[in-house]
Amino acid sequence: MIKLSKKYCLGISFVLYILLSVCEGHKNLTCDFNDVYKLEFHPNQQTSVTKLCNLTPNVLEKVTIKCGSDKLNYNLYPPTCFEEVYASRNMMHLKKIKEFVIGSSMFMRRSLTPNKINEVSFRIPPNMMPEKPIYCFCENKKTITINGSNGNPSSKKDIINRGIVEIIIPSLNEKVKGCDFTTSESTIFSKGYSINEISNKSSNNQQDIVCTVKAHANDLIGFKCPSNYSVEPHDCFVSAFNLSGKNENLENKLKLTNIIMDHYNNTFYSRLPSLISDNWKFFCVCSKDNEKKLVFTVEASISSSNTKLASRDNTYQDYISNSSFLTLSSYCAFITFIITSFLSFIL
């Protein structure tokens, strides 16, 4: 029997544990049909091929599709992917994303060739309905010649290498802690206000409309302004007003994550950090000339031990549901580390 030294056993187990732990922390949310799920045709290929890329992101995470380049003449379907999506794998039931998944925002596109989109990205919106899949497709099409047999003439045939993008939109257990200033009953935010109703009822009252939410560690927060209002500060959640009315950089206080600033839809989202060291209040404003200001105020409470444990549990559950293979691998690596460490002392 080969006897391994303590240092060798410890070294191998430690490296394995670190490598798999690092892998667990990396979650790939890209369907890359250029370099990963390749759609190139093989020599003598005579049949179509389909490849599936399945993504299971968390809310507010970004998903990306890479489909074609200046050298790869692929086509993305629908051409307006993420503005429109299919509701099934058979390229049927085309839906507008804002109607199919309420609260959708933040589409990003990149084009390497004229009049053709090669890369699209999309932030997963808060979804209060049961989880649902959405689909886009990347295709590489080729016409081949089929040689005739028994005296029959040759014929032409189209074959398609198709990449299917399946994205599972997760479901939230509770509404986003926030304010929707466009409707009295918001489907996404915990509080809703109809600016028209408020204006009619309080036409003589010039006081601003203040909506306050109390939030804790790891909570989703956000707000929506009417389309004809502007947002102050422009980079809300990167910075915000403190109670003195001074614009302050939130990075120095809270370090919010998953920030979405969608000025096109006037919708802003973010997530509080898992640890809040001090109570903190800040606000952002929806403003319009000669109109009441619509004030979104957040009261972020200091983390208690229970809150910190709860946020850890939530993070743990997210990893289980979205990276189960890697999580299992890290457990195996950890067990390997313990066993190998023990053996190194008895060998």
Curated annotation (Swiss-Prot):
A biological process from GO: symbiont entry into host
Disruption phenotype: No visible phenotype. Parasites grow at normal rates in vitro.
Pfam families reported for this sequence: s48_45 (PF07422)
6-Cys domain span: 27-172, 175-305
Glycan-linked positions: 28, 147, 200, 228, 242, 265, 322
Keywords linked to the UniProt accession: Cell membrane, Disulfide bond, Glycoprotein, GPI-anchor, Lipoprotein, Malaria, Membrane, Repeat, Signal
InterPro entries assigned to the protein according to its UniProt record, in alphabetical order: 6_CYS_dom, 6_CYS_dom_sf, Parasite_Repro/Invasion_Surf
Lipid attachment locations (GPI-anchor amidated asparagine): 322
PANTHER family tied to this protein: ANCHORED PROTEIN, PUTATIVE (AFU_ORTHOLOGUE AFUA_4G09600)-RELATED, PTHR38796
Gene3D superfamilies in the record: 2.60.40.2860
Post-translational modification: Processed into a soluble form.
Keyword Repeat carried by entry: yes
Keyword S-adenosyl-L-methionine among UniProt keywords: no
Gene source species: Plasmodium falciparum (isolate 3D7)
Propeptide: 323-347
Residues spanning the signal sequence: 1-25
Subunit structure of this chain's protein: Heterodimer; heterodimerizes with PF41. May form an antiparallel heterodimer with PF41.
GO cellular component: apical part of cell; cell surface; plasma membrane; side of membrane; symbiont-containing vacuolar space
Protein's name in the database: Merozoite surface protein P12
Disulfide cysteine pairs (residue numbers): 31-53, 67-138, 81-136, 179-211, 225-286, 236-284
Extra information: Does not have erythrocyte-receptor-binding ability.
